[in-house]
C-alpha cells in the first residue's frame, strides 16, 4: 500500500506543471517552446494548405471522421502488403482480412485491442507506419474533440480540428514521447531495426528473442492512452517494462493526458467566469487579481470533476488491491500458503501492489496495456477493471473520459433541477430537452453495445467456440472483451480464442461505433449550448463547483452502472466469487 500511495503522490507533484502547459497549448497562450513549435506548426499548415479558420460543430466532426477514415485506408493497405521485404527482417507475412480490419479499427479508435501477437504478426514497417502512427493520431483525435467540446460548453467557438490536431501532436505528444523513449532505452528497452535474436537454451532448444523499435512504440503507447504492445505479453515482458522505474514511467505516462484535460477544462471554465465578472462590471480585473488568476491551476469546476473521478478510482483501486492481497481462496483450500497474495499471472519484480495499481490505472484511463495477466485476477480483482471499463468515466482515455463525465454532469444537473423545481443549468447554459435527449442517447450507446454483442456471442456457435472457460468465468471473458472494445481500452481476459471471423468483425464494429457515435453526439451538445445566451447565476442556481456536486456525480454514475450492468455482473464475476 505504501508503494501505491508514494507513486500517486509523486504523480500529483508532476501533473501540475504539465497540466498548466497543456492548458497553454490548448488555448493558444504563449509557452517557453513557442519559437520552435510555431515554425513547425506553420510549416505543416503551409505544406498541407490548411485553412485555420474556425469550424461549426458539424464541420469539426466531419473533418475528424474524414482524417481518421483516410488513415484507416492507408493503414489497412500496409497491413495487407507487409510481407514485402522492406523493414521486414523476420519475414512476417501479410495479415489476414478480418484480422486486418480488426487491427486497423482498433488502433484508429485508440482501443489497441490485439487479436495477434506483435512479434509474430507485424513487420517493423507496419509497427512504425501503422501502429505507432495511429497511436499519435488517435490520441490527438480524442484530445481535439475534448477541447472542442469544452469550448462549446463554455460558449466559445469550436475551433479548427486540423489546428488542434497538429498542435497537440507537435507541441506535446512528439516531444514528450521522445523524452520518455530515451528514459526507456536507458533502462534497457530495445530500440533497433535488427532481426530477432536466436539463441540456444540450457535445455538445448532454439529460442527467439524479439527485437525492434520497441522503445519508440512503448512511449506513445502509454502517453496516448493506447495500450497495444509491441510484444504479445505487452508490458509484462522485461523487453517492454524491465524495471520498477520503467513501470512507474509507464504508469505516469498513461495518466498525464487524461488528467491534463481536466486541468484544461477547469482553467477554461475559470477564465470564462472571470470574463463574465469583468463584462458585468461587478469585478475589475486589477493587476493583483491578474497575478492571482495566473496562480489558478485547475479551477473549481475542474476540481469538482477531478474529485469525482478520484473517488471512483480510489474505490476501485482499494477493492482490487485488497482482493489480490488476500490471494485465491481455491489455492488456500488446497493447502498452499500465499504469503505475497495472489501472484498467479504476476511479475515478481512488481508484486501485488504495483500490479493492482497498474491494472486499475490501465482500465480507468482506458489504456489497455498490462503488466500482469488480467485473466488470472481473483473474481473481485477482475471485477474492478471490468467495472471501470463499463463506467468509462474514471478519468478515461485521452480526452474522451472527460467528455463522458461532462455528459454525466449534465444529467446530474438535470436530475437535481427536477428535484428542486428549477430549470437545470450547467456552466451558465440552460439545459433543455434537446440536450437531454442527446445526453441520454450518448450514455445508452455504451451499455447497449456491450450487453447486446455479449448476448449475441453466447447465443451463436461462432461466439461460443471462442470461450475456453466454462461457467461463470467464460461469461466474464465475453463481457470483458466487449467492454474493452466499447471503452476503447484494448486489454483482455486472454483465455478467449478471439482471432476468428466472428470476434474480429464483432469487436471491430463495437470499437468503431463506441468511438465515433458518442463523439459526434457530444460535439452536437456542445454546438447546441454554444449558441445559447449565458444565464446569470442566482441564489437558486445549483453550484456545480462544490464537493457536494462531486458526490452527486459519483452517485449518478454508480446508479446508472447498477441499472444497466448489475444483472450481467451478477452472472459473471460475482457468481464466480461466490462459488470459489
Regions found by a protein language model. Give the residues of each.
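Membrane-proximal intracellular helices of multi-pass ion channels
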Residues: 1-580
Amino acid at each position: 500500500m505504501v508503494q501505491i500511495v508514494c507513486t500517486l503522490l509523486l504523480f500529483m507533484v508532476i501533473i501540475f506543471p504539465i497540466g498548466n502547459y497543456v492548458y497553454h497549448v490548448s488555448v493558444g497562450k504563449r509557452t517557453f517552446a513557442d519559437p520552435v513549435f510555431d515554425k513547425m506548426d506553420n510549416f505543416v499548415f503551409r505544406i498541407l494548405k490548411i485553412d485555420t479558420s474556425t469550424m461549426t460543430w458539424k464541420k469539426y466532426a466531419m473533418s475528424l471522421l474524414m482524417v481518421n477514415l483516410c488513415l484507416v485506408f492507408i493503414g489497412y493497405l500496409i497491413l495487407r502488403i507487409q510481407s514485402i521485404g522492406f523493414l521486414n527482417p523476420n519475414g512476417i507475412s501479410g495479415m489476414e482480412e478480418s484480422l486486418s480490419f480488426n487491427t486497423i479499427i482498433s488502433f484508429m479508435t485508440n482501443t489497441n485491442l490485439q487479436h495477434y501477437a506483435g512479434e509474430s504478426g507485424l513487420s517493423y514497417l507496419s509497427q512504425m507506419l501503422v501502429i505507432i502512427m495511429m497511436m499519435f493520431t488517435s490520441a490527438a483525435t480524442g484530445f481535439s474533440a475534448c477541447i472542442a467540446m469544452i469550448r462549446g460548453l463554455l460558449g466559445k467557438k469550436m475551433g479548427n480540428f486540423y489546428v488542434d490536431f497538429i498542435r497537440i501532436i507537435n507541441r506535446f505528444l512528439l516531444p514528450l514521447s521522445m523524452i520518455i523513449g530515451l528514459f526507456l532505452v536507458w533502462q534497457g528497452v530495445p530500440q533497433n531495426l535488427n532481426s530477432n535474436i536466436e539463441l540456444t537454451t540450457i535445455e538445448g532448444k532454439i529460442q527467439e528473442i524479439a527485437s525492434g523499435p520497441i522503445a519508440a512504440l512503448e512511449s506513445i503507447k502509454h502517453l496516448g492512452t493506447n495500450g497495444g504492445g509491441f510484444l504479445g505479453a505487452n508490458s509484462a515482458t522485461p523487453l517492454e517494462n524491465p524495471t520498477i522505474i520503467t513501470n512507474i514511467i509507464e504508469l505516469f505516462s498513461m495518466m498525464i493526458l487524461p488528467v491534463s484535460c481536466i486541468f484544461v477544462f477547469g482553467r477554461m471554465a475559470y477564465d470564462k467566469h472571470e470574463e463574465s465578472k469583468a463584462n458585468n462590471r461587478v469585478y475589475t480585473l486589477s493587476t493583483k487579481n491578474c497575478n492571482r488568476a495566473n496562480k489558478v491551476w485547475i479551477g473549481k469546476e475542474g476540481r469538482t470533476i477531478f474529485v469525482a473521478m478520484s473517488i471512483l478510482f480510489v474505490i476501485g483501486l482499494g477493492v482490487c488491491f485488497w482482493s489480490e492481497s488476500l490471494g485465491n481462496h481455491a489455492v488456500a483450500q488446497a493447502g498452499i500458503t500465499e504469503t505475497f497474495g495472489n501472484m498467479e499471472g504476476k511479475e515478481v519484480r512488481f508484486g501485488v501492489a504495483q500490479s493492482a495499481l497498474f491494472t486499475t490505472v490501465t482500465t480507468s484511463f482506458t489504456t489497455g496495456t498490462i503488466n500482469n495477466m488480467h485473466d488470472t485476477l481473483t473474481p473481485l480483482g477482475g471485477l474492478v477493471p471490468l467495472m471501470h471499463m463499463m463506467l468509462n468515466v474514471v478519468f478515461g482515455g485521452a480526452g474522451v473520459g472527460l467528455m463522458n463525465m461532462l455528459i454525466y454532469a449534465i444529467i446530474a444537473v438535470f436530475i437535481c433541477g427536477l428535484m428542486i423545481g428549477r430549470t437545470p443549468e450547467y456552466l451558465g447554459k440552460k439545459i433543455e430537452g434537446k440536450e437531454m435527449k442527446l445526453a441520454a442517447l450518448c450514455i445508452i450507446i455504451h451499455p447497449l453495445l456491450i450487453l447486446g454483442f455479449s448476448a449475441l456471442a453466447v447465443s451463436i456457435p461462432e461466439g461460443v467456440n471462442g470461450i475456453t472457460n466454462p461457467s461463470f468465468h467464460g461469461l466474464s471473458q465475453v463481457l470483458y472483451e466487449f467492454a474493452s472494445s466499447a471503452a476503447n481500452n484494448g486489454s483482455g481476459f486472454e483465455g478467449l480464442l478471439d482471432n476468428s471471423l466472428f470476434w474480429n468483425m464483432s469487436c471491430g464494429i463495437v470499437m468503431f461505433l463506441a468511438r465515433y457515435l458518442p463523439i459526434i453526439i457530444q460535439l452536437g451538445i456542445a454546438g447546441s449550448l454554444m449558441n445559447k445566451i449565458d444565464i446569470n447565476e442566482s441564489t437558486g442556481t445549483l453550484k456545480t463547483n462544490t464537493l457536494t456536486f462531486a458526490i452527486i456525480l459519483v452517485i449518478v454514475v454508480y446508479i446508472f452502472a447498477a441499472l444497466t450492468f448489475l444483472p450481467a455482473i451478477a452472472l459473471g464475476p460475482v457468481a464466480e466469487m461466490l462459488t470459489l
